[in-house]
């Protein structure tokens, strides 16, 4: 009796004996689909990574351009101030011309 119960349990739990295996063309089609899907996912991942890297590089490029523009404005401002101070010191070095009585 115990053997009979074990035999029935074994038969019921092993579903592979009851169903037929899939036909080879169907299995090949599934395999081809899986290969395509895997490769397509890899391609999409690479494209996404490339886009993210390009976005990061563009943002860095914009920051560098802003910093250069800011530096250029600061240099222009410093040069203008330096030029103004030089001109003022030159003008202060010249004696002031007073109208002479001879003229």
UniProtKB/Swiss-Prot annotation:
PROSITE patterns: GLUCAGON. It is found in: Secreted. The keyword Signal applies. One of its GO terms (cellular component) is extracellular space. It comes from the Eukaryota. Pfam families: Hormone_2. Its main location: secreted. Keywords: Secreted, Signal. Residues 20-30, 74-103 form a propeptide. GO terms for biological process: adenohypophysis development; adenylate cyclase-activating G protein-coupled receptor signaling pathway; growth hormone secretion; hormone secretion; multicellular organism growth; positive regulation of cell population proliferation; positive regulation of growth hormone secretion; positive regulation of hormone secretion. Residues 1-19 form the signal peptide. The keyword Signal applies. GO terms for molecular function: growth hormone-releasing hormone activity; growth hormone-releasing hormone receptor binding; neuropeptide hormone activity. PANTHER family: GLUCAGON-FAMILY NEUROPEPTIDE (PTHR11213), SOMATOLIBERIN (PTHR11213:SF6). Belongs to the glucagon family. GRF is released by the hypothalamus and acts on the adenohypophyse to stimulate the secretion of growth hormone. This is Somatoliberin. It comes from Mus musculus. The gene is Ghrh.
């Amino acid at each position: 009796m115990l053997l009979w119960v074990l035999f029935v349990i074994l038969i019921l739990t092993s579903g592979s004996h009851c169903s037929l295996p899939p036909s080879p063309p169907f299995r090949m089609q599934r395999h081809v689909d899986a290969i395509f899907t895997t490769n397509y996912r890899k391609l999409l991942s690479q494209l996404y990574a490339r886009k993210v890297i390009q976005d990061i590089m563009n943002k860095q490029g914009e920051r560098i351009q802003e910093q250069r523009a800011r530096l250029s404005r600061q240099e222009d401002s410093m040069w203008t101030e330096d030029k103004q101070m030089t001109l003022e010191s030159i003008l202060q070095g010249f004696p002031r011309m007073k109208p002479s009585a001879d003229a």
